[in-house]
Amino acid sequence: MSLAYGIIAIISLSMVGICVLADKKRDEWLIWLFVSVAVCNLGYFMLSVSKELDAALNSNRIAYLGSVFLPFFLLMMVQRFCKIKSNKKITTLLILLGVVMLGITTSPGILPIYYKTVDIEFAGGATKLVREYGPLHMLYYVYLGLYMLSMVGMTLFAIAKKKVTSHLHTFLLLSAVLCNIVIWLVEQFLPRGFEWLSVSYILTECLILMLYRSMQRQGLMFNKPRPSSYTIDVLMVIFLLLFANCVRIITKGTTPTMYVISHIVVLIIYIGILVSWGMSVYDRIVHKSIRRYLVILMGLMMFWMLMRTL
């Protein structure tokens, strides 16, 4: 089962790269949606290979870092697709609400408010948390439920007001909204041996990207001035660097397998940042010889990163 989580995590990280390459306009909510899915699925994988309770709890915190803000980013994208004007005060309030919820969901091992008790067990080739829910655990269900109702309500409102006129766009939007809801509801009533939401997140990404690209080609996106791509790129780099070092710190002193995996993840992130920067600079260079030197320099830097990691 750990192998399945590992494959899903790699696919999620790859989807972030696909999103950056596919979205030349750098839509901030779209990028953060893909990043949150990658963070969540990476947390699931790290949890599945954890050997100690502390490592499992830290991995669970990484998973919640992605899953807590994922509904918010998805709601922002649905709002864009439905051509509903955003309200800065409501957006700020939702971000603050997410921060509070993140504090609650990452409290296990510190406070008994989300889980009263928590331990780990090894079953099916993976590590799982054995927990007794605390008094504030129900708040997370309420949090998710409100987001789900908001997304469904926005979608139905947009269809009724003919803000979404294409049958294909309607189908993709409804599928993206309902996909996670259906999987989440099924998981509540069936024995959960596997986090099927990790798979549904990737399906949702594919649907969102298909819808986004289709609407973009038809000129239905970016009715408002779009943010600076440079600013988004800088924020993405800062986030990825912080995330990479967070993974390295959390896995420090754990099992050899986790040590190797964490370094591979960090290496992928560093190389991704380097390649993105190189491509950006390469496009701005006219002289062929300077381009050649840039490619050689990037190759040497990637080789150095690989040797340093090994």
Language-model-derived ranges and their functions:
Residues 5-13, 62-70, 143-148, 199-207, ...:
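Membrane-embedded alpha-helical segments of multi-pass membrane proteins
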